[in-house]
């Protein structure tokens, strides 16, 4: 979901998929990577795969694929090595567990959430039957991520807390990347539920711990990825608090971090650039917002992702409107509407229609004057 309207500018965000309601900020639509905003995000990547989710703060164009599909696919592959090799000639209990976990992840990718939950409960019983501590922890983590994906935040936090207890019992410390990944997710969910103080404290603590880790392991890509994810989510919180300059700086730091990990051409970069443009709009720096959106659109062309381009075009139209460039605003919003219809993207169509209505309202107001 992208933030829709320049006032809504910072409204809807991504999933992995998730984010703040952009309408609270301005009127631009956030890009969306995950269903609940989160998605970047990347959002709900499970612990064992050491991934992170990103979201944005405008109307966010839906990333190709389902919520965090890439990361769930990674998780499915990861389970192959979770318990070590197995005899190909005979299906062992461990193999049956791995197969069940993989099926549950495929269900999540297809957004068959009820079926996925049933499969995970079955996997949990199987892991308990063979007394696999790693398997039990992994399944609980997947359950928590599924609940987060479904916006069942209270349930997700409870399960994540149980996972943390298990990790501590296994010898992990507060500096463990797995602990910090969960801490970041809990802080993000607190923000989405409106507990801004808890969210602020959680992000502040998590970033402090990650900074210490990076001093020891500056080239660790998993930690860098989590650092970028957490800064992006923290930036969304600051946007909600009206701290636009601080948010913009965090988004830029997150962007630089992710480029270091992935390179410039990736969905996460598009999402964060969209967030940066939202911050600029709220700071009334429209030229900077425009340039940032144009940079994001160049990336969507390299990614061949026309679905995101529609929302970005609508956001660009709203920036032109703020600048008083009516002709450019109308052209951008009409192109956004066309792209939204062509690629069956209701978020882009809605944002484009909002933009066109704003142009009409502005022109009518000028005529009356």
UniProtKB/Swiss-Prot annotation:
Q: Pfam families this protein is in?
A: TPR_12 (PF13424)
Identify its protein family: Belongs to the TTC19 family.
Q: Species name for this entry?
A: Drosophila melanogaster
Q: Identify this protein by name.
A: Tetratricopeptide repeat protein 19 homolog, mitochondrial
GO biological process, alphabetically ordered: mitochondrial respiratory chain complex III assembly
Effect of disrupting the coding gene: Low fertility, adult-onset locomotor impairment and bang sensitivity, associated with mitochondrial complex III deficiency.
Question: Which InterPro entries does the UniProt entry name for this protein?
Answer: TPR-like_helical_dom_sf, TTC19
Location in the cell: Mitochondrion
Signal peptide residues are none
The UniProt function text for this chain reads: Required for mitochondrial complex III formation.
